[in-house]
Amino acid sequence: MAIKTVQDLINEGVQGRHVLVRADLNVPLSDGNITDPGRIDASVPTLKALLEAGARVVVSAHLGRPKGEFKEEFSLAPVAEALAERLDQWVPLATDVTGEDAHERANGLDDGDILLLENVRFDARETSKDETERTEFAAELAALTGDNGAFVSDGFGVVHRKQASVYDVAKKLPHYAGGLVEAELNVLRKVSEAPEKPYAVVLGGSKVSDKLGVIEALAPRVDNLIIGGGMCFTFLAAKGYEVGGSLLQEDMIDTCKDLLERFGDVIALPTDVVVAERFDKDADHRTVDLNSIPEGWMGLDIGPESVKAFAEVLSKSKTVFWNGPMGVFEFPAFAEGTRGVAQAIIDATAAGAFSVVGGGDSAAAVRTLGLNEEGFSHISTGGGASLEFLEGKELPGVSVLES
């Protein structure tokens, strides 16, 4: 069954109706300041469209992992301010999630007004494994929309989670996909169902175990699978290299051997790495080939020869999916691998390739390194969700919209 969209809701008539919007506003904070507002920016178009159509918008979202109790550092107060700036209107923040203050403020909304509920994860029922508890909380969220409410799911970064504000609440109200969720699904379908060949996937990040599902799902279908980041050292160990003090998942070595046996013709690994004597931004470091990693030193980035080889592969690709940095990009000395590969993807895109950055740390790296975001075809807001989609897993927050 086709999923109804926020545009369908607006066409049906939304003026004067309360609309609950689940957004993904889980942004990184430092001393109470937002360091990367990407997810807030991505949620604005859907909110604007509803407000301009005269809806009374109630926004639910989470921030961090407060474990079911109020914690000041996880309050959505900085997010309310950032939203107000972008929407050019006041965004009041309820002091609770579904309590007295939330109800009072929701009831007091006029057409075109917006309310942000406090962090949904301040209520332990949001993430409960007990369906009865989640259903009860979802009913309380739905009650904020009165008699003629609707639910818009626009937090793509959370659709892979079976949580009250994402999944259970959709069963309580007429439900629609927001513009962001709709756009994300369209892009991922394009990449997974009929990618233009040659198709290259670039995977980084620290653990093989985190990416195993996506490697298994994609390796048989791609032309090139480039592996960097901390996870490459378990693959290199599987090939017999001494990796020194680099990150190593010993229990995954046999799995990597098996993957290399089956997909060795498409898997590309680094040929040189940047090693450091300790994990520190100012650590003594040098570039070495794979046979020369000093004992006890740790690989924190891929080397320039690897970047060159990977860039060559990417320059011939027509579809590129990238998830996970090539090194510890937060430390300038170990950011060049990520920068080089990202730039190669931007260059491939300029030459006509369709490129997707799969959210999470990759999207953060693009912004941290000051790369041109417009240089990619699409930057996803959902790391985990985009990986699970490409693995072929059901996304609860999407499947519930189909019912």
Swiss-Prot record:
Which SUPFAM superfamilies does the record match to this protein?
A: Phosphoglycerate kinase (SSF53748)
Question: Which residues take part in binding ATP?
Answer: K211, G299, E330, G359, G360, D361, S362
- Identify the coding gene: pgk
Tell me a GO biological process for this protein. Answer: glycolytic process
| Name of protein | Phosphoglycerate kinase
Per UniProt, subunit arrangement is: Monomer.
Q: Which reaction does it catalyse?
A: (2R)-3-phosphoglycerate + ATP = (2R)-3-phospho-glyceroyl phosphate + ADP
Q: Which Gene3D superfamilies does UniProt cross-reference here?
A: Phosphoglycerate kinase, N-terminal domain (3.40.50.1260)
Cellular component annotations (GO), alphabetically ordered: cytosol
Major subcellular location class:
cytoplasm
